[in-house]
Structures are given as structure tokens and as C-alpha cells.
């Protein structure tokens, strides 16, 4: 029985590791998009300063790409927020449900009001 209780901790550690990897990948994706946006903004500014009709026309496409990237970043942050909230909910459910310690005694958490 004690092995069953302790094996749950290993599963939790693996789950936390996967969650952390997922968060890290999302943050890397966001940073890549933000870096791309910085390049787009620089090009848009250069085109604007040149005042050449072809460059100004190209800005239309660049601005659309910039807007799409902003939507992608907002979506990624929304997904991150949702995943984080879900993981916190799952974590708090596990902690408040009364688990067994490795010595077999119940582990009930008390919450103070206030």
C-alpha cells in the first residue's frame, strides 16, 4: 500500500515536468513571434520613412502580418493562462482531498478564514 501512495508522487512529478516543458515551449514560441514582430516593425518604419509608393504599399501586407502575429501571441497567452489555471485547480484538488503520507497517516489541510 505504501508503494501505491509513493508512486503517485512520481506521477505528479512527471506531470509537473511535462507541464513545465509545455509552458517553456509556449514562452519560446511567444518570444519567437515577438522577435519577428520587432523585425516587421523596423521594416514598416523604414518603408514609411522612405515615402516610396512601393514601400508604402508593402507596409499593408507587413501590417496585416503584424496583426496576425499579435493575435497568435494573444492566443498563446490565453492558452497558457488556461493551462496554468487548470494545473493549479488540479493541484489544489489533490492537496485538499486528504492524501496519505508515506507513514500511512492522513494528511488533511486546514484552511484559515480571514
UniProtKB/Swiss-Prot annotation:
GO terms for MF: protein homodimerization activity
Biased segments, Polar residues type: 89-100
Gene name tied to this protein: EFL4
Localization, UniProt: Nucleus
Protein name: Protein ELF4-LIKE 4
Pfam families in UniProt: Elf4 (PF07011)
Induction: Follows a light-dependent circadian-regulated expression with a small peak in the evening, about 12 hours after dawn.
Function summary: Component of the central CCA1/LHY-TOC1 feedback loop in the circadian clock that promotes clock accuracy and is required for sustained rhythms in the absence of daily light/dark cycles.
One cellular-component annotation, GO: nucleus
Subunit record text: Homodimer.
Primary location recorded for the protein, binned into one broad class: nucleus
GO biological process: photoperiodism; positive regulation of circadian rhythm; rhythmic process
